[in-house]
C-alpha cells in the first residue's frame, strides 16, 4: 500500500458525496484522475486489502432485518460451515474469533421472520446451536481507522 492508497482509503472512510459523479469530486480532492481511483479500488479488492467496497444501507426503515449470530464450531468443521455460509445471500459476512463461540456472522434479510428462518436453517443443516444476538440499540460512533 502506497501513500496514495492511504490517502484514498482515509478519505473513503468518511463516505462518498451523494451526487452524479462522486469519483470525479474525489479525484479533484485527491489531485488525481477518476480512472486512478477506480483502478486503485479494483487493485485493493483484488489483492485482498479491501474485502468489500459498496454502500451500507439501514435496512430496518425499509422493512428489512438483521442480526449478529455466533456459533461454537468444532475446528474440524470450521471450513465446512464457512463454505456453507458463503453460498447464502442472507449472510453478509462471517468470521473467526478466538473464543468458545468461534464463528460470528451477520444475517441480513427482508424481514424478521426470514432472519429467524435463516438461523433455524443453519441449525438444521449444520447440526450446531446458533446464538442469536439481535441489536438492542444503535450507536453511531464515527469509527475511522487512520492509515
Curated annotation (Swiss-Prot):
Q: What is its EC number?
A: 4.1.1.111
| Provenance organism | Pseudomonas aeruginosa (strain ATCC 15692 / DSM 22644 / CIP 104116 / JCM 14847 / LMG 12228 / 1C / PRS 101 / PAO1)
Per UniProt, subunit arrangement is: Probably forms a complex composed of NirD, NirL, NirG and NirH. All proteins are required for the total conversion of siroheme to didecarboxysiroheme.
Which family is annotated? Belongs to the Ahb/Nir family.
Q: Which gene encodes it?
A: nirG
The GO biological-process annotations, alphabetized, read as: heme biosynthetic process
Protein name from the UniProt record: Siroheme decarboxylase NirG subunit
Q: Which Gene3D superfamilies match?
A: 3.30.70.3460, Winged helix-like DNA-binding domain superfamily/Winged helix DNA-binding domain
Q: What does this protein do?
A: Involved in heme d1 biosynthesis. Catalyzes the decarboxylation of siroheme into didecarboxysiroheme.
Entry coiled-coil feature ranges: none
Query: Which UniProt key words apply to this protein?
Result: Lyase
Q: What top-tier enzyme class does this entry carry? A: lyase
